[in-house]
Amino acid sequence: MTGNIVSRRYAKALFSVGQKQGEEDLAAYGLALTELSQILEDSPEALRLFQNPVFSADEKKAVLEKLLEKTSAGPVVKNFCSLLADKGRLPVIPEIASDYAGMLDNVQGVVRGKLVTAIKLTVKRQKEIKTRLEEQLKSKLELDFAMDKDILGGVVLQVGDKVLDASIRAQLQMMKEQIKRGV
């Protein structure tokens, strides 16, 4: 099985446990997984250890327990991670966390997006843009803002799986293609 299928299956299993426990636990499990995933992202040597077949499941569990102490993980998430260690699935924790977060967003009606501009936007302007987009989408929006001078001007908006590229760079690229085709 590929990591994607595996991670979705484990995320779905933990998610169903969280749904039975209630919305508070559902969010807490997601937070703990996100924290653990961030620790692994910041510590690639721990992730390499989890991938290394030379180390036993018990050795990996010992390292995992130390990492879990740095998170808000409760007993359910700790047991879940122990199961992952037993099954040799610790390397897919970041993907499981991502899949779990997507499921949680879906249940809570949250859409994630990213807005890239050529200049830094003020906090007031960011709030205005976010509010207008939420009104248009008719759902709660978690919007990340980024700056990229390479787009020259305009905006690149990604919401969910849709991308709107209204940057000057994209417009210049389209003009270039039209000139090449002789239009």
UniProtKB/Swiss-Prot annotation:
**A Pfam family matched in the record:** OSCP
- Any one GO molecular-function label of the UniProt entry: proton-transporting ATP synthase activity, rotational mechanism
The record, for InterPro entries, names:
ATP_synth_OSCP/delta_N_sf (IPR026015), ATPase_OSCP/d_CS (IPR020781), ATPase_OSCP/dsu (IPR000711)
Gene Ontology CC: plasma membrane; proton-transporting ATP synthase complex
Compartment(s) of residence: Cell inner membrane
NCBIfam families annotated for this entry?
A: ATP_synt_delta, PRK05758.2-2
Record-given protein name: ATP synthase subunit delta
